[in-house]
Design a protein with these regions (language model features):
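Conserved C-terminal "lid"/linker of ANL adenylate-forming enzymes
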Residues: 99, 125-130, 135, 151, ...
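C-terminal boundary motif of the adenylate-forming
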Residues: 76, 119-147, 180
């Protein structure tokens, strides 16, 4: 695991038996501090490979470091084995993406996102989790078009045609039902979902320079889609 601010890396996994999400242990010379934030442990770094600050942006720099000089990453980590720290750390989502429902319940976006992508088997290319200050969790699904075409039995169709096809919508409902069966409460239950009928824009900040989606910007840029998820009268695009 690494970021621009910890060039070239912060943690490294070198032991056999690696798996998705395994980050390993801090590189030599780097201090890792785990700070409780929003019910998780935020990774904070201090060392010679950590940048000193943002160029000519003193206010942003001040916010990026804590009182002990550790860089605050916004990444949540957890131990592979709490009794043996040498086994390394596991990525536990982005704290900056997490939010509270209007009940005060924390929603951990990274966990829900990974679960829905896994359950989607190609239909769900990615997903934006919604629900900040709302009663329930919603999802804006970025569709895997090849999977949509296969399910719908169509080739060369437009995005709008594919995501509105009954067979594709039915498959999304099955995914929601499967996840609901594993839910432990409002913090893990996705009640409504809608396919994104728009193409993600790099220019509008919806895709990061690393190729991942920017949840916050997608929600900000498409308020009409979020509004449909929480409307009293549900339209036909909502699953």
């Amino acid at each position: 695991l690494g970021c621009t601010e910890t060039c070239p890396s912060a943690l490294f996994a070198s032991e056999p038996g690696g798996f998705a999400g395994l980050l390993g242990v801090p590189v030599p010379g780097l201090e890792l501090k785990l700070t409780p934030v929003a019910g998780k442990l935020e990774a904070r770094y201090r060392g010679k490979n950590v940048f000193p600050g943002y160029w000519r942006q003193p206010e942003l720099t001040a916010r990026a470091f804590d009182e002990e000089g550790f860089y605050c990453t916004g990444d949540a980590l957890r131990f592979v084995d709490v009794t043996n720290p040498n086994k390394g750390m596991i990525f536990d989502g982005r704290i900056a993406e997490d939010f509270k429902l209007n009940t005060g319940t924390w929603v951990h976006v990274g966990l829900l996102r990974s679960q829905m992508i896994a359950a989607g088997h190609g239909l769900v290319q990615d997903v934006v989790i919604t629900g900040h200050d709302n009663e329930f969790i919603g999802a804006i699904v970025i569709p895997g078009l090849d999977s949509c075409r296969k399910i719908a039995g169509l080739s060369g169709s437009t995005l709008e045609v594919l995501v509105s096809h009954p067979a594709v919508r039915h498959e999304l409902q099955k995914i929601l039902n499967e996840l609901a069966g594993k839910s432990t409460g409002s913090a893990t239950l996705i009640e409504r979902a809608v396919f994104a009928d728009f193409t993600l824009s790099l220019d509008r900040g919806e895709i990061t320079d690393k190729g991942s989606i920017n949840q916050k910007m997608i929600i900000q840029n498409h308020p009409e889609v979020v509004a449909r998820l929480y409307a009293t009268e549900i339209d036909e695009s909502i699953v």
